[in-house]
A protein has these predicted regions:
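A structural signal for multi-pass alpha-helical bundles of membrane permease subunits
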Residues: 1, 5-181
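Short, small-residue-biased leader/transition segments that mark boundaries at the very start
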Residues: 2-4, 186-192
Length: 195
């Protein structure tokens, strides 16, 4: 039964990872028609749902990679102490996974903050446009005020820099923890075989 559990986990992880291979441009037309049919065209809720849907594969990939590095002994000892699944998950696993949560949050924030294609296609009114779209329409039809455009660009970039600097430690540790754990596993396997 343990083999089936592992195969099921691998299947669902691969299923969500396939979302990383699908380009967003290939889904623009169906998304546009779906948003109109659902009454979500030109709404921030519709745009947020699209960002969440396209951000899930990356988030699941980062989080599942990190969860695999957490020693099972921690969870098993919590179960032996009488802790249930949800208590173990919320009090042990989530605090350990803070670097991965920070990494996923920063990655998805940066993607959503700088996204242009969906915002241009799925919004029409000025009140629902994102900052990259506002920058795109910042220039007038016959003249361009480059000084104002560059100032607006700097103002749009500043929040991304602040978020990255604030969570830089978590991003670096979240990205490197999985690689360190995997390399330790590969190093320890030959020594086990030699014994």
């Amino acid at each position: 039964s343990d083999v089936y559990k592992r195969q099921g986990k691998t299947f669902f992880r691969l299923l969500f990872s396939v979302g990383l291979l699908i380009p967003g441009a290939a889904l623009l037309q169906p998304l546009y028609q779906t948003m109109i049919a659902m009454g979500l065209y030109d709404s921030l809720i519709g745009l947020i749902l699209v960002y969440i849907a396209f951000g899930l594969p990356t988030t699941i990939y980062v989080m599942s990679s990190y969860f695999m590095t957490i020693p099972k002994e921690l969870e098993e000892s919590a179960y032996l102490d009488g802790s249930g699944f949800f208590k173990t998950f919320s009090l042990i696993v989530i605090p350990i996974a803070k670097p991965a949560l920070g990494t996923a949050a920063v990655l998805e924030f940066l993607v959503a903050w700088n996204e242009f294609q969906f915002a241009l296609t799925l919004t029409a009114s000025n009140s629902n446009r994102t900052l990259p779209i506002a920058l795109y329409y910042f220039k007038s039809q016959f003249a361009s005020n480059y000084g104002a455009m560059f100032a607006a660009t700097i103002l749009v970039i500043i929040p991304s820099i602040i978020v990255y600097i604030a969570l830089q430690e978590q991003v670096v540790s979240g990205l490197s923890a999985g690689a360190v754990k995997l390399s330790l596993i590969h190093i320890s396997e030959p020594t086990r075989q030699a014994e």
